[in-house]
């Protein structure tokens, strides 16, 4: 569906866009990059290496899938950030936005902690699956409403290690 070279090219483009934003808008202030675990770790690690600006790394865990292929609709925080974000610029880095529920939840949760700004980046965006209105500031690819794996995305813990993104068919 999306091969390794396309992913690398797009992640580098996003890194350049975020670098330009940081240099223009943030001046000498760091950007805290919050990786949403587990699925975003590959995208996150490649993205932060493509950014030539002052960034800080942190991690947050959130789940709305469990072992299913469709969101349960209930978002749970499974791991919190380790540093205060009050008065800071924050970017949530997510693997995929489908229903929008997770990003909406995280955005509201982090905004309540009084950062200067909360932004978001997502590798994949499924506009046809949206249940709440949410659009990331930076999007890698828009895709159809299919279940996908690879490049950090999994099915019941499997396939995260694929270097590409593949559509899963005939799940039973």
Predicted stretch roles:
Residues 1-172:
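PRPP-associated nucleotide enzymes
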């Amino acid at each position: 569906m999306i091969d390794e070279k396309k992913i690398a090219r797009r992640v580098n483009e996003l890194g350049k866009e975020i670098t330009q934003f940081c240099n223009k808008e943030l001046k000498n202030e760091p950007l805290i990059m919050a990786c949403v675990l587990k699925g975003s770790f590959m995208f996150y690690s490649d993205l932060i290496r493509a950014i030539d600006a002052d960034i800080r790394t942190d991690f947050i865990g959130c789940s709305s899938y469990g072992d299913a292929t469709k969101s349960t609709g209930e978002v749970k925080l499974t791991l919190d950030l380790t540093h205060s974000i009050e008065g800071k610029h924050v970017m949530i880095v997510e693997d995929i936005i489908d229903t929008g529920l997770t990003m909406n939840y995280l955005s509201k949760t982090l905004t309540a902690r009084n950062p200067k700004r909360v932004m978001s980046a997502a590798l994949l965006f499924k506009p046809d699956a949206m249940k709440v209105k949410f659009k990331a500031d930076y999007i890698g690819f828009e895709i159809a409403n299919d279940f996908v794996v690879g490049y950090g995305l999994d099915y019941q813990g499997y396939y995260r290690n694929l270097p590409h993104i593949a559509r899963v068919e005939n799940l039973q």
